[in-house]
């Protein structure tokens, strides 16, 4: 399990002895993976399916930072390779998701009242991302803090905070 937070500038890794049971998780003994050279307020994290690419959403830099990992899900083997500025659509990005093949990316956050869709011409390569459209959530009167899709991409789930 991997966690980022706005008060730190790193990715924290946890090991769970039982699948999907957070009561069995403990923080790994190694140092957290610093993303301070890319953003001081990481707010979201995602991986490609085999863990060889990690994406960290930066609330401060208003961008998506891409890392290549030579060994899947091993943060000690990751290095920064690209970023995508999303400030034109979301000035305080907090939530991110990809479709299953990495050709679509979705961003939501505090500043906008919408989910922004991007097409990636090369799967899981944010440098090839192009803004497509935005889906308004104004009628739900909240700010997006979490974003996920079901396995077939037909249902979108949002976590909202009302302020």
Identify the meaning behind each predicted range:
Residues 161-163:
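Conserved small/polar residues in nucleotide/adenosyl-binding loops
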Residues 49-50, 100-101, 151-152:
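Residue-level detector of Asp-centered blade-edge/turn motifs that repeat once per structural unit
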Residues 29-35, 81-87, 132-138:
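A short beta-strand motif characteristic of beta-propeller blades
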Residues 15-23, 68-76, 119-127:
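Short loop/turn segments immediately following beta-strands, especially the blade-tip
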């Amino acid at each position: 399990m991997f966690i980022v937070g706005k008060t730190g500038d790193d990715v924290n890794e946890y090991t769970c002895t039982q699948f999907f049971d957070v009561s069995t998780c403990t923080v790994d003994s190694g140092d957290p993976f610093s993303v301070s050279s890319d953003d001081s307020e990481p707010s979201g994290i995602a991986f490609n399916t085999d863990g060889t690419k990690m994406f960290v959403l930066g609330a401060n830099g208003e961008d998506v930072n891409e890392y290549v990992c030579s060994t899947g899900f091993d943060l000690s083997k990751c290095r920064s390779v690209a970023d995508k500025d999303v400030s034109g659509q979301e000035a305080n990005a907090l939530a991110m998701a990809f479709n299953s093949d990495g050709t679509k990316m979705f961003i939501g956050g505090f500043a906008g009242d919408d989910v922004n869709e991007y097409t990636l011409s090369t799967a899981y390569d944010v440098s090839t991302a192009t803004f497509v459209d935005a889906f308004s959530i104004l009628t739900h009167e909240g700010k997006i803090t979490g974003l996920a899709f079901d396995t077939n991409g037909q249902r979108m789930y949002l976590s909202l905070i009302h302020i």
